[in-house]
């Protein structure tokens, strides 16, 4: 089975990208896939959310060519998810080695890369490795503008990864949130997927664990995974 590489990007802090990455990791692991979650963010948000040490030194050394062993740890046994911790040491990485070269030897069915919001070299690294790019943002102007810049960068990649915009923390009581998916689908000519606001998801992340298997957000994450499955082998125009 070919390994799927998914890049979860968000150019603005608070975009919901880390919750999306952790949620998809939990979904695929519960479905029986071997999951490798790569925290490429110097902030180490995903690493901290899972209760691991957010230094990032080992991953930074691997990307720089001075490390040899992939520094992954199993952060959950049920379902099992392997994590490559991120952290501040990644901030100094320049001219990094390709992700598929340094991580390709890890046995995984799905590799999820939680990208940094403001590090061009690391962001580009993830985009170049990805089969799928999910640009996370909230339904407001600044967040959407950041996601648009990321999606625009994928146009120069060959082959171009499959791309979708993922609106996070959607609240159907807000008129803008209800209207945004249709408006943005027309503007971007790309699929627009949604993750609804869900207290259970926020509580799980604050408690230092994987997102729950039930709830509104869990159903939305399942729909995102279904889109990824459905579009396998299809490109982005």
PLM regions: where:
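Inter-motif core of Ras-like GTPase G domains
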Residues: 122-141
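Anionic-ligand binding region
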Residues: 132-135, 144-163
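Beta-strand-loop-alpha "switch" segments that mediate conformational coupling across diverse proteins
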Residues: 169-174, 181-210
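Walker A/P-loop phosphate-binding motif and the immediately C-terminal alpha-helix
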Residues: 2-42
């Amino acid at each position: 089975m070919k390994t799927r590489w998914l890049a979860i990007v968000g150019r603005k802090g608070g975009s919901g990208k880390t919750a999306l990455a952790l949620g998809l990791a939990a979904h695929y692991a519960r479905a029986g896939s071997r999951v490798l979650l790569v925290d490429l963010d110097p902030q180490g948000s995903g690493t901290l959310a899972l209760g691991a040490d957010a230094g990032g030194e080992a991953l930074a050394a691997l990307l720089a060519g001075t490390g040899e062993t992939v520094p992954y740890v199993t952060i959950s046994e049920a379902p099992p998810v392997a994590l490559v911790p991120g952290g501040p040491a990644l901030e100094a990485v320049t001219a990094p080695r390709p992700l598929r070269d340094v991580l390709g030897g890890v046995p995984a069915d799905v590799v999820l890369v939680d990208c940094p919001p403001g590090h061009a070299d690391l962001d580009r690294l993830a985009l170049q490795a990805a089969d799928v790019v999910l640009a996370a943002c909230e339904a407001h102007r600044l967040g959407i503008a950041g996601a648009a810049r990321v999606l625009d960068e994928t146009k120069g990649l060959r082959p171009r990864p499959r791309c979708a915009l993922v609106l996070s923390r959607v609240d159907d009581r807000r008129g803008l949130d209800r209207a945004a998916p249709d408006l943005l689908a027309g503007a971007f000519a790309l699929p627009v997927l949604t993750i609804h606001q869900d207290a259970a998801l926020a509580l799980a992340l604050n408690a230092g664990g994987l997102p729950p298997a039930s709830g509104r957000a869990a159903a939305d994450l399942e729909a995102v995974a279904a889109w990824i499955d459905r579009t396998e082998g299809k490109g982005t125009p």
